[in-house]
Swiss-Prot record:
A Pfam family recorded for this sequence: DUF188
InterPro entries linked: UPF0178 (IPR003791)
The protein, known as: UPF0178 protein BCAH820_3075
Transmembrane segments: none
Organism: Bacillus cereus (strain AH820)
Coiled coil: none
Recorded family membership: Belongs to the UPF0178 family.
Source organism, top-level taxon: Bacteria
NCBIfam families membership: PRK00124.1
Length: 146
């Protein structure tokens, strides 16, 4: 198993790095050049930089990921592609994407886009909380223990 993180705006990178390093599982953070950092990463953690274009990180993750790798993303499109490839896919708020829930998530995203396109406003996501982080940590630990 390898772990790939859609790292632009991912609020749980610290949890992923800490828990994966402890378990000696390699982590690849995929992020745009606009988030470039000279920060030293622990052994087993790699950062790949991609262009800032739409979906560039998603495409790179899909090139790299293999069946049974673990992907962390908030992007439903990437989650859908990764599930089809046989990957385990987690959202940073602590839930697992499945073949059963991805259809509804994609449909909701589409309907919200149609509402916005018609000039109306839609609600954004709720703020990320400490409870969300702990929920993610518990799920992540259970997934890497498999």
């Amino acid at each position: 198993m390898k772990i790939y993180v859609d790292a632009d705006a991912c609020p749980v990178k610290d949890v992923i790095i800490f828990e994966a390093t402890k378990a000696e599982i390699p982590v690849t953070l995929v992020t745009s050049f606009s988030h470039y950092s000279n920060a030293e990463q622990p052994k087993g953690v790699e950062t790949i930089y991609v262009d800032s274009g739409a979906d560039a990180a998603d495409y790179r993750i899909m090139q790299l990921a293999q069946k049974e790798d673990l992907i962390v993303t908030q992007d439903y499109g990437l989650a859908s592609l990764a599930l089809a490839k046989g990957c385990i896919v987690l959202h940073h708020k602590g839930y697992k994407y499945t073949n059963e829930n991805i259809e509804q998530l994609l449909q909701t995203r589409y309907l919200s886009a149609m509402v916005r396109k018609s000039g109306k406003r839609t609600k954004g996501p709720k703020p990320f909380t400490a409870e969300d982080k702990e929920k993610f940590r518990a799920l992540f630990k259970s997934m890497i223990a498999l």
